[in-house]
Amino acid sequence: MDLNKITSPSFLKNLNKKELEQVAQEIRTFLIEKCSVTGGHIGPNLGVVELTMMLHKMFDSPKDKFLWDVGHQAYVHKILTGRASQFDTLRQFKGLCGFPKRVESEHDEWETGHSSTSLSAAMGMAAARDIKKEHNYVIPIIGDGALTGGMALEALNHIGHAKTNMIVILNDNEMSIAPNVGALHSVLGRLRTAKEYSKAKEELESLINKIPVLGGKLASTAERLKDSLKYLVVSGVFFEELGFKYLGPIDGHDFEALEMTLSHAKKVKGPVLVHVITKKGKGYKPAEDDTIGNWHGTGPYKIENGAFVKSETKGPAWSSLIAETVRKIAHEDERIVTITPAMPVGSKLQGIQQDFPNRFFDVGIAEQHAATMAAGLATQNMKPFLAIYSTFLQRAYDQVLHDIARPNLNVFIGIDRAGLVGADGETHQGVFDIAFLRHIPNMTIMMPKDENEGQHMVKTAIEYDGGPIALRYPRGNGIGVPLDDELVALPIGSWEVLREGKDASILTFGTTIPMAMQAADMLAQQGIDIEVVNARFIKPMDKDMLHRILSNHKPILTIEEAVLKGGFGSGVLEFAHDHGYLNAIVDRMGIPDQYIEHGNVDQLLEEIHMTAEDAVARMQVLLQQKQQVGLNK
């Protein structure tokens, strides 16, 4: 069939097994072809084709509510709800979002991008349904990786206690992004291999029900016998102990098994968990064979052999550079312990993991635990390196503030994907960390201008013993500068002048330095002499340099690829005010008070007026203001 002509999932209700299998194959072919051009989360989506089809066949969306945890596995859902024709624009500027989006479709009931949120949201929707005396199903779909998140476990506890009518689909593919870790993963592993459990339990219950009632003693014995079977077959029936009816595990690629089990689940009163076993990447061999997470989310690739299409780059990947520098120093410093919340592949930590298995901890999708574990290590004079994406550090804010910074512990926080990240969009843009870290006492924040300075900042962070220190580094690759062989620690709070200039100053750091230098070149052609400062320490700032610039009455333009509210530019304004420079002429360029959508980073910067041309225009206004207030020197 022509997938582009689908307008509603209702067509699935009349299809037989053979027809369903044909549609499933067409969807897989479609996804493989489209994602080979745009990139995307191909592995997770190939694994949920049959499951998604059967959910839409057995339930009535949008009346019945589907909540896709994380949301990266919702491509099939988008195809079935009439958006196949938009897949050429997947994750592109102004195109189809890679995650559920309420403005896209009435079928996207829950927006997400971060993990472990679906169960809590589902509890809220179910509670609203019950309060309003409505009758519909609420169906969160959560992966075994996301289920390790503390928020998901909190929600399971509440849902089971409240006996809320809800059908939880556990999509178990044994991976989140990288292979899963933890005790819960082991529990699920036992359930996967205990497929005879459900059958045996049903047979035993049937047998017990046929026994005549001869008194409480026999009934009690029978109940103990049932309980004994549970614990003999599966050590710790986790979900049933939490108050859920457990159904499964079942083959998530078997239409008949899915139909039978979902039909049963619809009849259950109270919460039910359907445990579905799926194969991540099913139907495309390179993705099926992936055991470490390379095919979780990809860029473009060649369909015939699965080779990734690499863009031209000059320098090493930032994640690789930082991780490799930590690895080298860790060979000399046994205090260094690396922690990651389920991102060993994304943050390029495999080398550290291989060299130091006893000093490497992948804690799963557990950012709060990761941060406080780092604090615990620091109390014992270890040097924890917490490698975490900027967007996921948001989830550990209280732990950073309360457990790390308040006791002033020496924790090195590597903030990966700092700044705009592009195609993953508003849920993943790393633009908030400066604002929520800068106001925390004892915190040091830095960001390098290039990869050479980046490796020196790793050395700085490891040697620093004055409290927590955060090193921000962007997604993508460096600019290709030579790397020094010998690493040195930088003076904390020191800036450097990259370009002398008497008329005005641009203060910036990290990825926006090339833009600032370009703007200075453009202004030089107009006879305007601009100083460009690498404000590499966002906190503490270089007070001596700020005093020099402000006392000379030089207009200042700050540029940051981060939110303006509470950001670096705000810090410069605060400094000017607090030190009596009440006539300071300061303007700020950065991320406005809005969420930034998906798209190419250059397109996004142009959209929010953060280009060299915009910097030139703003600087011209500043210089005019200087003339108007009569501060010419």
From Swiss-Prot:
<keyword id="KW-0786">Thiamine pyrophosphate</keyword>
<dbReference type="InterPro" id="IPR020826">
    <property type="entry name" value="Transketolase_BS"/>
</dbReference>
<feature type="binding site">
    <location>
        <begin position="113"/>
        <end position="115"/>
    </location>
    <ligand>
        <name>thiamine diphosphate</name>
    </ligand>
</feature>
<dbReference type="GO" id="GO:0030976">
    <property type="term" value="F:thiamine pyrophosphate binding"/>
</dbReference>
<dbReference type="Pfam" id="PF13292">
    <property type="entry name" value="DXP_synthase_N"/>
</dbReference>
<feature type="binding site">
    <location>
        <position position="367"/>
    </location>
    <ligand>
        <name>thiamine diphosphate</name>
    </ligand>
</feature>
<keyword id="KW-0808">Transferase</keyword>
<feature type="binding site">
    <location>
        <position position="173"/>
    </location>
    <ligand>
        <name>Mg(2+)</name>
    </ligand>
</feature>
<dbReference type="InterPro" id="IPR029061">
    <property type="entry name" value="THDP-binding"/>
</dbReference>
<dbReference type="Pfam" id="PF02779">
    <property type="entry name" value="Transket_pyr"/>
</dbReference>
<comment type="pathway">
    <text>Metabolic intermediate biosynthesis; 1-deoxy-D-xylulose 5-phosphate biosynthesis; 1-deoxy-D-xylulose 5-phosphate from D-glyceraldehyde 3-phosphate and pyruvate: step 1/1.</text>
</comment>
<dbReference type="InterPro" id="IPR009014">
    <property type="entry name" value="Transketo_C/PFOR_II"/>
</dbReference>
<keyword id="KW-0460">Magnesium</keyword>
<keyword id="KW-0414">Isoprene biosynthesis</keyword>
<feature type="binding site">
    <location>
        <position position="284"/>
    </location>
    <ligand>
        <name>thiamine diphosphate</name>
    </ligand>
</feature>
<dbReference type="InterPro" id="IPR049557">
    <property type="entry name" value="Transketolase_CS"/>
</dbReference>
<comment type="subunit">
    <text>Homodimer.</text>
</comment>
<dbReference type="InterPro" id="IPR005477">
    <property type="entry name" value="Dxylulose-5-P_synthase"/>
</dbReference>
<comment type="function">
    <text>Catalyzes the acyloin condensation reaction between C atoms 2 and 3 of pyruvate and glyceraldehyde 3-phosphate to yield 1-deoxy-D-xylulose-5-phosphate (DXP).</text>
</comment>
<dbReference type="GO" id="GO:0019288">
    <property type="term" value="P:isopentenyl diphosphate biosynthetic process, methylerythritol 4-phosphate pathway"/>
</dbReference>
<dbReference type="InterPro" id="IPR005475">
    <property type="entry name" value="Transketolase-like_Pyr-bd"/>
</dbReference>
<feature type="binding site">
    <location>
        <begin position="145"/>
        <end position="146"/>
    </location>
    <ligand>
        <name>thiamine diphosphate</name>
    </ligand>
</feature>
<dbReference type="Pfam" id="PF02780">
    <property type="entry name" value="Transketolase_C"/>
</dbReference>
<feature type="binding site">
    <location>
        <position position="144"/>
    </location>
    <ligand>
        <name>Mg(2+)</name>
    </ligand>
</feature>
<feature type="binding site">
    <location>
        <position position="72"/>
    </location>
    <ligand>
        <name>thiamine diphosphate</name>
    </ligand>
</feature>
<dbReference type="GO" id="GO:0008661">
    <property type="term" value="F:1-deoxy-D-xylulose-5-phosphate synthase activity"/>
</dbReference>
<keyword id="KW-0784">Thiamine biosynthesis</keyword>
<dbReference type="GO" id="GO:0052865">
    <property type="term" value="P:1-deoxy-D-xylulose 5-phosphate biosynthetic process"/>
</dbReference>
<dbReference type="GO" id="GO:0016114">
    <property type="term" value="P:terpenoid biosynthetic process"/>
</dbReference>
<dbReference type="GO" id="GO:0009228">
    <property type="term" value="P:thiamine biosynthetic process"/>
</dbReference>
<dbReference type="GO" id="GO:0000287">
    <property type="term" value="F:magnesium ion binding"/>
</dbReference>
<comment type="similarity">
    <text>Belongs to the transketolase family. DXPS subfamily.</text>
</comment>
<dbReference type="InterPro" id="IPR033248">
    <property type="entry name" value="Transketolase_C"/>
</dbReference>
<protein>
    <recommendedName>
        <fullName>1-deoxy-D-xylulose-5-phosphate synthase</fullName>
        <ecNumber>2.2.1.7</ecNumber>
    </recommendedName>
</protein>
<keyword id="KW-0479">Metal-binding</keyword>
<dbReference type="GO" id="GO:0005829">
    <property type="term" value="C:cytosol"/>
</dbReference>
<feature type="binding site">
    <location>
        <position position="173"/>
    </location>
    <ligand>
        <name>thiamine diphosphate</name>
    </ligand>
</feature>
